[in-house]
Amino acid sequence: MKCKTIQVLWHGKDPVLSVDFNPATGQLASCGTDREIKLWRVGRDAEGNPEVTHEDTLTAHTKTVNVVRFSPGGDALASGGDTGEVLLWRPGVGSTNHHGDATSWRQSGVLRGHSDDVFDLAWAPLGVALVTGSVENTCIVWDVAKTKGVFRLEGHAHYVQGVAWDPRGEYLVSQSGDRTVRLFASRGVPHPIASPRWCKNVSCQEILSRGEENADPSAAPGTARSKPGKQALYHDDTMQSFFRRPAWSPCGSFLATPSGTHKEHAGAREQHVTYLFERDKFSRPAVRLPGLSPAVCVRFSPTFYAKKDASATTTTPTTEADASLVPAKPYRVVFCVCTTDTVTVYDTSETTPLAFIGGLHYAAITDAAWSPDGMTLVVSSSDGYCSVVTFTESELGRVLTPEEVPEHVRGEMPEVRVRAVKEAAERAAAVAEEKREATALAAAEKEKAAAAAAGAGAELPANGPRRVAPAPVADANANANANANANANAPRRVAPVPVSEPAGDASAVPKRIAPEPVADPATTAAPAARRIAPEPM
């Protein structure tokens, strides 16, 4: 095992609040109070030491980003933050962030329903829906395809600080600062997740809040402390952490809840614990895992490991329960418990830790994530850094192939789950394409039938009945007035009147006077001048 706190500016020295691995590509996503989501490539150098390379920065949030989670198929990313922002991202080229840099992911949707901070979210199997937990004391189930809320889970009296979705699709888990864990389920005939009928049957099936408390052996007989009683299972809202992130094992057989507290008896000192419940047996924890400080999150490795030899297995019984209460499985599941300052790695075959890591960070741990191959663990912290822990096969065990895993849990392996999600998406696309083709064909047939009907009406036989289009009847008075006005303005022909001989006195009849030509002054000689003799006075 090698552990290293990577000295890079993950989010500009701001707190890193969540991390998650893409199950399909192995890409790491991180988010924090700088309002950005960053994508990294985690690898190992020539000496086997962990190293990271920055690949993308996604910018669309306007406030702190509290959680980021990839879908089970790795084809989508969901992020939740302050003021109720929940954004969906999908791979896409040609996009740029607010810094002007090209990105390989684009924002594909916004889920609007919360009015206050979202602390945690979890995807449903096959990525058809997701659930978010908010400081409004409620959770919302979202239909991812329609980008709308379909059901609100209520009942908590304080902030919802963690949620988890059963990989078998039956249970929804929410954990709150009110010291309770609630399990919701849709009972009755199975229906598709997030469908209207599924939502109609969802209700709270279990509330985990109280556990058994042993009698105080030092108490006087007959007193209250001398009798067994009940105690709270979880810390109250004075626990200094924004997150209480529960988790399901990849096979769905176990539920782990952090932020637990336990007393051996009424007079004993309170201990910090993490509870491991067996599926459908939530009345009491199967295993109680102690810690030095309050646990804030639990994360399971997505792979299954081969069982250890019986001689190599050691079991440390607990007062609450013994490891023998955990049913034997043909495989092992590995998980980590993160407290505010330590990381402890366990597997389901024993209660003795496989690894214990402390002193990684100067501030509280906020989240953790396992790589798809189950050999790398990344831990985030409020001090602005992330630590990478790498394991070998000799430390965790051999990872089983899909053929070695029981059939009923084979579908939860990362490579099988990614393939199943891809096939489901292809089937959905094929069905949608068939519907589009059927709609287009129906429209074409309808148009063809309408054209045929129109053509048949135009080719009726000559001796058959025909429809005569009515013609409007003109107003006779209006036509007459119009003609009169038109004739008044048009030129008229005057009929000639013949001239006849006058009957009677010829002198009374006007005579025709022959015209006389006027002499041309230019050609006519002027009369000769005459001398006028003067007359004597």
Please place each PLM-identified region on the residue numbering.
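Conserved strand-to-loop turn within each blade of WD40 beta-propeller repeats
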Residues: S30-E36, G73, S79-T83, P91, ...
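Beta-strand-rich domains and repeat architectures in extracellular enzymes and scaffolds
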Residues: L9-T33
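Structural hallmark of WD40 beta-propellers
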Residues: T25-A29, G74-A78, L87, G109, ...
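Terminal intrinsically disordered, low-complexity extensions flanking WD-repeat/beta-propeller proteins
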Residues: G188-R244, S249, K263, G267-H272, ...
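Short C-terminal beta-strands that terminate individual repeats in beta-propeller domains
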Residues: T5-H11, E47-A60, T96-T103, Q107-G113, ...
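WD40-repeat beta-propellers
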Residues: V19, I37-V42, V68, V86-P91, ...
